[in-house]
Swiss-Prot record:
Binds as a heterodimer with protein bS6 to the central domain of the 16S rRNA, where it helps stabilize the platform of the 30S subunit. It comes from Cutibacterium acnes (strain DSM 16379 / KPA171202). Part of the 30S ribosomal subunit. Forms a tight heterodimer with protein bS6. InterPro entries: Ribosomal_bS18, Ribosomal_bS18_CS, Ribosomal_bS18_sf. One of its GO terms (biological process) is translation. GO terms for cellular component: cytosolic small ribosomal subunit. GO terms for molecular function: small ribosomal subunit rRNA binding; structural constituent of ribosome. Keywords: Ribonucleoprotein, Ribosomal protein, RNA-binding, rRNA-binding. NCBIfam families: S18 (TIGR00165). This is Small ribosomal subunit protein bS18.
């Protein structure tokens, strides 16, 4: 009763920070930070963004700093 087996296709993930050629993540760069936030306002997971552990940590800290300064919303009310 087993279904057909699927072949796994290994695609190389594109790291958004590397494609933009940014040395450091800045909390003032809201256009870049919005790529890592869901439409609900949550920080996207590392497995979704494709970032390394260090880069994900830098992005998360930058998003939190931008939220503190009201550059980014804490949560969205989109329904």
């Amino acid at each position: 009763m087993a279904g057909p087996q699927r072949k796994s296709v290994n695609k190389k993930k594109v790291v958004p920070i590397k494609t933009v050629h940014i040395g450091a993540v800045d909390y003032k760069d809201t256009a870049l930070l919005r790529k890592f936030i869901s439409e609900r306002g949550k920080i996207r997971a590392r497995r979704v963004t494709g970032l390394s552990v260090q880069d994900q940590r830098k992005v998360a800290i930058a998003i939190k700093n931008a939220r503190e300064l009201a550059l980014l919303p804490y949560a969205s009310t989109a329904r």
